[in-house]
UniProtKB/Swiss-Prot annotation:
Enzyme Commission number(s) from the entry: 1.3.1.101
Domain of life of the native organism: Archaea
UniProt protein name: Digeranylgeranylglycerophospholipid reductase
Keyword Membrane found: yes
Function of the molecule: Is involved in the reduction of 2,3-digeranylgeranylglycerophospholipids (unsaturated archaeols) into 2,3-diphytanylglycerophospholipids (saturated archaeols) in the biosynthesis of archaeal membrane lipids. Catalyzes the formation of archaetidic acid (2,3-di-O-phytanyl-sn-glyceryl phosphate) from 2,3-di-O-geranylgeranylglyceryl phosphate (DGGGP) via the hydrogenation of each double bond of the isoprenoid chains. Can use both NADH and NADPH as electron donors.
Binding residues annotated for a 2,3-bis-O-(geranylgeranyl)-sn-glycerol 1-phospholipid, in chain numbering: K338, V374
Cofactor note as given: Binds 1 FAD per subunit.
Length: 396
């Protein structure tokens, strides 16, 4: 049997950040990763804002940054004038395009340097509970089953998260309309603008969008995400993306060198994400932005918050629901309002026709985005396209 103050299940950005901060707080910390290699396989567009690195005290390093972009462009179905957002206005997925595998390894190394133990190829097999409190996990490590006892467990086991369900948290179960199926190529020999990440809306990606994340030197991540309510299987999803690439002048002569697929949760903030002795972070806590599908930044922030409350709980020997809810309060304050707004937008956008989407993009592209407001958009739409105001009022 092994004993720790903190057990972190999962070695992604949320888990590594939680482990790093817990270790920095002087807590004996173990992080486990089920795969033999942290950061692999990559299932992500690899976009991240600069601000999150600063907030989490992560020094930008060219070893894990493939490209730095100025902003994002959002195209309507006609692909005429796009909405252009500078990086500071474009959200948590715009600023850097990462080498995600190297980034995840870097974060794990920071956790280890802070004092955390790291075990790879060590999946959690079950939850250990004592008197209603999560008290550790059964782990397969070095071909043995090991009981690891911990005062606090932080579950960062991603979209496929099992640990929370094993412990009895039902909130992490997703409705079908809150699951996106995603497929992405890494492409070479492409001709795309290296200064902007591009997003394409409309029937080319039903109830979702297509993205192009430039990585520099003729390389880009080109992917599609669509609701599983609209796409029946990944072959259909692949056909949509292949059709887009064939018709894109800068992509059609490129070659794909990697194909990755996966699922993404796009729900409102779900509670509870704690119980005595357990907190969920990142994708495991369903903290993916419902409109962008991005989750790296939210995973990092939630990992920081989890470590902060863990420190307080261990120092006071208090693992009550009231203590655990301090973490939930931080999560709600940071994410709840934004995720609700973006969830409503996601649901509404899925129902808009290509013609209406074009009109919306046309209006917003004309606005001065430093002073943009709901009132300004509605007024502009009423003046130019009065027939679609009713259709859009719930969205904006």
């Amino acid at each position: 049997m092994e004993t720790y103050d903190v057990l972190v299940v999962g070695g992604g950005p949320g888990g590594s950040t939680a482990a790093r901060y817990a270790a920095k707080y002087g807590l004996k910390t173990l992080m486990i990763e089920k795969r033999p290699e942290i950061g692999s396989p990559v299932r992500c567009g690899e976009g991240l804002s600069k601000g999150i690195l600063n907030e989490a005290d992560i020094k930008a390093d060219r070893s894990f940054i493939a490209n730095e972009v100025k902003g994002a462009r959002i195209y309507g179905p006609s692909e005429k004038r796009p909405i252009i957002l500078q990086s500071e206005k474009a959200g948590n997925e715009v600023g850097y395009v990462l080498e995600r595998d190297k980034f995840d390894k870097h974060l794990a190394a920071l956790a280890a340097k802070a004092g955390a133990d790291v075990w790879v190829k060590s999946p959690a097999l079950g939850v250990i509970k004592e008197n209603g409190k999560v008290a550790g996990a059964k782990i397969r490590h070095n071909n043995e089953i090991v009981d690891v006892r911990a005062k606090m467990v932080i579950a960062a086991d991603g979209f496929e998260s099992e640990f929370g369900r094993w412990a009895g948290l039902k909130s992490v179960i997703l409705a079908r309309n809150d699951i996106i199926s995603a497929l992405q190529y890494r492409m070479i020999n492409v001709d795309v603008d290296p200064d902007y990440t591009d997003f394409y809306l409309g029937s080319i990606a039903p109830a979702g969008y297509i993205w192009v994340f430039p990585k520099g030197e003729g390389m880009a991540n080109v992917g599609i995400g669509s609701s599983i309510n609209w796409i029946h299987n990944r072959f259909e999803l692949k056909n949509y993306l292949d059709r887009f690439i064939e018709n894109h002048p800068g992509l059609k002569k490129g070659q794909d060198i990697q194909l990755v697929t996966g699922g993404v949760s796009v729900s409102k903030v779900k509670m509870p994400i704690t119980m005595p002795g357990l907190m969920l972070v990142g994708d495991a806590a369903r903290l993916i932005d419902p409109i962008t599908g991005g989750g790296i930044a939210n995973a990092i922030v939630s990992g920081m918050y989890a470590a902060q409350v863990t420190k307080e709980a261990i120092e006071s020997n208090d693992y009550s629901p009231q203590m655990m809810q301090k973490y939930e309060k931080l999560i709600k304050e940071r994410f709840e309002r934004k995720h609700l707004r973006n969830w409503v937008a996601k649901e509404k956008l899925a129902m808009l026709s290509d013609d209406t989407l074009d009109k919306l993009v046309d209006i917003v592209s004309e606005q001065v985005l430093t002073t943009i407001s709901v009132e300004a958009i509605l007024k502009a739409i009423a003046e130019k396209y009065p027939e679609v105001v009713k259709e859009l009022e719930d969205l904006i």
